[in-house]
Amino acid sequence: MSTPIKSHQIRRVAVLGSGVMGSAIACHLAQTGSEVLLLDLPSKEGPKNSPAEGALKASLKSKPAPLYSKRFVQRIECGNFDDDLSRIAECDWIIEVIVERLDIKQQLFERVEKYRKPGTLITSNTSGIPISQLSEGRSEDFQEHFCGTHFFNPPRYLQLLEIIPGPKTDQRVIDFFMGYGESVLGKQSVLCKDTPAFIANRVGVFAIQALFHTVEDMGLSIEKVDKLTGPAMGRPKSATFRTCDVVGLDTLVHVANGVASNCPNDERSESFKIPGYVQHLVD
C-alpha cells in the first residue's frame, strides 16, 4: 500500500447486513460521526429496501437504545444488495455483518470485490470464523486491507472491540483500527490472533456450552439458571439464557460448531458439542 490511512478518511461506511447486530453497528457508527449505507437482501414482495428499513426500525425500538439521540438516524440510508451494492465504491470502510456461514460470507465478498475501490478498508464482524478463510481467494489489495472487527452486542454499550488480522493484513490497517476503535468508536480495542472464536467467544461460548450440558445433566430450569448466573454471582442481569437471546442462539451454535470442528484435540472439545434441546430450539 502506498497511501497512509488516516482516521479522518472514515466519512462513509457500508454495513452489509441489517440484522440485530448490523443495525446496531450502523446506529453506533452514525452517532460517532459517519454517514452509513445499510444494505441487506432485497424483499421478495413489496419495496425492495423493506428488510433493511424494517430491521433499522426494530433496532430503534429496542432496549437499551442503540442511539443516544434519534436525530442520528438521519445519517443512515437503507438499501439492498441488488440495487445498491455498487455504492460501496463511495465508502471508506465496508463492514460485513451477515449470517455466520463461511460459504455465504465468501459469496458476498466475491460480489463486493467487483465494486470495492482499491485501498478501501474492509472488515468482518464474524464471531469466530477464521479471517484467513474469509479472505481466501480474494485479491492481494483486498487481503491487505481486510481484518476482523468484532463488536459485541449491544455495540453502543459494550466496550470490547476485537481486531483480528489475517495473514496478509497490512500493519497500518491493524494500527488504524486499534486507534480508531478507541479514539472514535469509544472502544477498548484488543488485538487477537486468528484462532477459532478469537478470545472472548472462545472463553464465553465455552462457559455457556459447559452450562448447557450441566443444565441437561441436572435437569435445571431456565428460570433457575438465570437467577443463579446473573447479579447473584456478579454477572449482568441478562444472566445466561437471556444473554443467548440477545446474542442470537443461532450465532452461538455456529461459533460452538466452529470451535468443535477446528479444535478437535482441545481437552474440553466435548463441551462445544450442542445439546439436543439447544439444537431443537435452533431448528
Where are these regions (language model features)?
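N-terminal glycine-rich phosphate-binding loop for ADP-containing cofactors
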Residues: M1-D283
